[in-house]
Amino acid sequence: MSYEPTLDHLVFGAPVLAAAVDAVHALTGVRPVEGGRHVGLGTRNHLLGLGGSAYLEVIGPDPDQPEPPQPRPFGIDALTSPRLLTWAVHPPDLDAAVARARRRGQDPGPVRAMSRRTPSGELLEWRLTVPADGDGPGPGEGTGADGGAVRLLPFLIDWGSTRHPSASGLPAVPLLALSARHADPAALRAGLDALGVELSVRAGPGAELAAVLAGPSGPVVLR
């Protein structure tokens, strides 16, 4: 059996969700549509197709929910500006992919079940890995230009029997390329190899994830 994962989605986080949706619209010429609320987590999202079975998730605080008892996911509470925070890949067998990564020295974290409802009321359910928070940045982590955390190693996700979000007729902007910058490319590549994932990585200060999209007048870069 092959364990090669495929790109599932990119995560673009923001301190104010509406402003992030406007920014993506201005950059790409296409407006992300509402995805739904993550009840209890204090977030909601908008979605934009990237071609094939991949999509962009624009996520931020949900002003219609009370403050959650725990920090919002992806370090959203610490953001001062919108940016790409991390990405997700979909392996054919989530549990087998986690076991293989651990054998290779890379622990993706525990697997957790999550869900949300779409604006039409459809329940989406999935499982994903949640990287453990350590005392300092790991091989796939770093700080972005605003000092916030960036995770360059993808998390793993499995949608089970749920219809994939990309199959819901999303407006789309083709993804042309995805790359990363990290202060220790060799360590990052080792983590990617353990997950069975390929990503173009260049050396540089801090950490950054960059997606090249087919904009209305040519390629544009979302960071």
Located regions from the model:
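Positions that flank functional sites
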Residues: V39-G40, R116
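N-terminal low-complexity or amphipathic/hydrophobic leaders
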Residues: E34, G40-S53
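Glyoxalase I/VOC metalloenzyme domain signal
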Residues: S2-L7, F12-R31, L50-R223
